[in-house]
């Protein structure tokens, strides 16, 4: 582990202006990004007394190998640069609020002819309005179940809508009047869009007008003795009231605000946000994050921040920066209810740079944003409610963490002691091979960090050299995967620490590399690492049945106690690698078993393959077809037709006159079928017939994701 004294900059060389700084590890990867009103005061405080730093901050300083900085002119500029760098480099020691793709929202696809209401997770899209986020998907479905009685808009997928349109019969929701059934023409596209717009107005807070309109319609229907319609409107009004009861009014003045609260301990913090739009709570979300405290120092206001002030600043910059980007990709329709940055943000404390934060948020919103601490009235009462939610979330997490964290720490320490490692194996990678009698030989690589799976770093491999033609060599396969994995690591390494490049997924080498197998497998992996010059990664093998831990060049295995937490962790890692390898093997085998002879035709994409089979009914009938019959299929030219016949092993038919052979002027000399269907000819076919651009078939897709 690097010594901070080896890279500590001289205090006189650090500027006193505001700026943004980056800590890098010995491999040159950015591990932490921060900003400061005075770079000299902030950076000096990191090295003044290492023991006084917070545990996570101390670990960061001990892990780093260099520090660099960029001077800016204003704190607003520093906020923006800090946010951009955190997003670009994804530093491992920065707090990240990652939930934008996991929290569900209610999406309304206004960009379609018949807009649809649906539960959605993922990046925002143009032409779609979003309401939420909701804490659970069932909350959205419950809302839809209530409101589709009043606003019978379409909720089905495009495939279901198309199928019912073809059979001219509505789905069950159409029969029970929870859908206006535009698929069968019960309402026109304009009428259905108006239903959807009324639905959006209701969720946007325009509830009083809709309720009054429905009451007037109910009264008019009763006066006209249309009691059936009046009763239906009465039930619809009741449904609206029930929906409104679920969104109680918290601000009588119709305020749009986000109410933020924190509860923290020495290691972690719970964050809770209530989204209030139109005076009603429209959504709620929460996080549990690891604290990354800045060191305190004297003589600089922004270094005297409390833990809560730092949490507020980190949350505002990261959360609203992400939300503004998501909102810019969606269609908010100018509706205040769906604006990702509200007029007010209510926080428990104001950080020293509150004015700069408010200016930055105003720039994201496009109008003034007020950053305030509620002190009385309804806003103070709601802030206390959010605070209680944060405290409850942290208490529940600590109960779970107490068991999980202690067990994981004990497991890592047990492995370290049993294998004689210098440090605990915080990052463990495991390789497993999967095949059936030498066919579809694949490998998996799974990653565990701090004893927990990191699925974003999982990889699978199609074995290229050590398998094929029904043969399989597990030892050679392990060696191949090890070589490919660590070749990627060495190629990703940045010799120049100043290189401006975001680290890839495998920028960090593992502390422990586990292979599924015994002495032969682990010795093969160790030999590869030695060839590549990788000497800072420990390698072991975990043999099945007896659960023996094999170490390279050792005649006897290491036996961990059966009740050892370290053995349990290694088993979980091995079993996860086994599961991931089997799932990929099954997928690959399924694709092979359902492969068609047409897959090998170069330039013939999936759509044209399906068109051929649909036209002739089967590949057997396609074999019997002439070139003229094949070219009758839209998008298929003569060259492609001949390539199809060649792939199917069919001799050239006389259904059409052959082209002259290249280089001869004799039109009666038949061209070589291999030269007739070149890739260029097939490409010409596609352009000549108006077919779509080149498509990659299944056999040409890159299987190896690494």
Swiss-Prot record:
GO terms for cellular component: cytoplasm; excinuclease repair complex. SUPFAM superfamilies: C-terminal UvrC-binding domain of UvrB, GIY-YIG endonuclease, RuvA domain 2-like. GO terms for biological process: nucleotide-excision repair; SOS response. It is found in: Cytoplasm. Signal peptide: none annotated. Residues 208-243 form the UVR domain. One of its GO terms (molecular function) is excinuclease ABC activity. Interacts with UvrB in an incision complex. This is UvrABC system protein C. The gene is uvrC.
């Amino acid at each position: 582990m690097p010594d901070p004294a080896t890279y500590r900059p001289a205090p006189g060389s650090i500027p006193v202006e505001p700026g943004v700084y980056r800590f890098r590890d010995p491999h040159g990867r950015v591990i932490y990004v921060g900003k400061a009103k005075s770079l000299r005061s902030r950076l000096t405080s990191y090295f003044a007394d290492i023991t006084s730093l917070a545990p996570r901050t101390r670990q960061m300083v001990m892990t780093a190998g260099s520090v660099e900085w960029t001077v800016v002119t204003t704190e607003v500029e520093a906020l923006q640069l800090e946010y951009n760098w955190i997003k670009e480099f994804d530093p491992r020691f920065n707090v990240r609020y990652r939930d934008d793709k996991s929290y569900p929202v209610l999406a309304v696809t206004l960009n379609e002819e018949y807009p649809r209401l649906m539960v959605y997770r993922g990046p925002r899209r143009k032409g779609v309005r979003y309401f939420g986020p909701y804490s659970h998907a069932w909350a959205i479905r419950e809302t839809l179940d209530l409101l589709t009685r009043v606003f019978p808009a379409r909720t089905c997928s495009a495939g279901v809508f198309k199928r019912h349109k073809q059979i001219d019969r509505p789905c069950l929701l159409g029969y029970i009047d929870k859908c206006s059934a535009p698929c069968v023409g019960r309402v026109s596209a304009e009428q259905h869009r108006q239903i959807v717009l009324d639905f959006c107005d209701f969720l946007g807070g325009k509830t009083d007008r809709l309720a009054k309109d429905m009451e007037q319609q109910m009264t008019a229907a009763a006066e006209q003795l249309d009691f059936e319609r009046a009763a239906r409107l009465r039930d619809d009004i009741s449904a609206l009231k029930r929906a409104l009861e679920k969104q109680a009014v918290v601000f009588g003045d119709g305020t749009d605000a986000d109410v933020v609260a924190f509860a923290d301990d020495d290691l972690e913090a719970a964050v809770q946000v209530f989204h209030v739009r139109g005076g009603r709570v429209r959504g709620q979300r929460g996080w549990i994050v690891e604290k990354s405290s800045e060191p305190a120092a004297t003589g600089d206001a922004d270094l005297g921040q409390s833990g809560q002030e730092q949490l507020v600043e980190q949350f505002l910059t990261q959360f609203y920066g992400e939300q503004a980007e998501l909102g810019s990709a969606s269609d908010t329709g100018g509706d205040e209810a769906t604006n990702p940055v509200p007029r007010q943000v209510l926080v428990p404390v104001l950080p020293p740079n509150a004015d700069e934060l408010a200016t930055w948020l105003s720039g994201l919103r496009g109008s003034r944003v007020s950053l305030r601490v509620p002190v009385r009235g309804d806003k103070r009462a709601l802030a206390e409610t959010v605070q209680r939610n944060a405290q409850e979330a942290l208490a529940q997490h600590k109960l779970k963490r107490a068991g999980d964290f202690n067990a994981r720490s004990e497991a890592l320490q047990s492995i370290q002691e049993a294998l004689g490692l210098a440090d605990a194996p915080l990052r463990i990678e495991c390789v497993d091979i999967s095949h059936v009698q030498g066919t579809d030989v694949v490998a998996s690589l799974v990653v565990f960090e701090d004893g927990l799976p990191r699925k974003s770093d999982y990889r699978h491999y199609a074995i290229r050299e050590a398998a094929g033609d029904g043969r399989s060599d597990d030892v050679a396969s392990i060696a191949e995967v090890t070589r490919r994995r660590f070749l990627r690591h060495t190629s990703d390494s940045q010799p120049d620490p100043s290189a401006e490049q975001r680290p890839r997924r495998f920028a960090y080498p593992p502390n422990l590399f586990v292979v599924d197998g015994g002495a032969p497998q682990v010795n093969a992996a160790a030999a590869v690492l030695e060839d590549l010059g990788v000497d800072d990664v420990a390698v072991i093998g975990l043999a099945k049945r007896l659960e023996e831990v094999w170490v390279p060049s050792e005649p006897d295995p290491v036996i961990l106690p059966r009740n050892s937490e370290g053995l349990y962790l290694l088993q979980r890692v091995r079993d996860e690698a086994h599961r991931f390898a089997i799932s990929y093997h099954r997928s690959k085998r399924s694709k092979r078993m359902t492969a068609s002879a047409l897959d090998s035709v170069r330039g013939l994409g999936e759509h044209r393959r399906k068109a051929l089979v649909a036209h002739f009914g089967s590949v057997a009938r396609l074999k019997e077809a002439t070139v003229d019959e094949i070219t009758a299929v839209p998008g298929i030219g003569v060259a492609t037709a001949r390539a199809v016949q060649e792939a199917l092993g069919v001799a050239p038919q006389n259904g059409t006159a052959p082209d002259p052979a290249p280089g001869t002027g004799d039109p009666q000399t038949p061209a070589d079928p291999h030269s007739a269907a070149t890739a260029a000819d097939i490409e010409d076919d596609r352009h000549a017939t108006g077919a779509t651009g080149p498509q990659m078939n299944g056999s040409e897709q890159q299987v190896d994701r690494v």
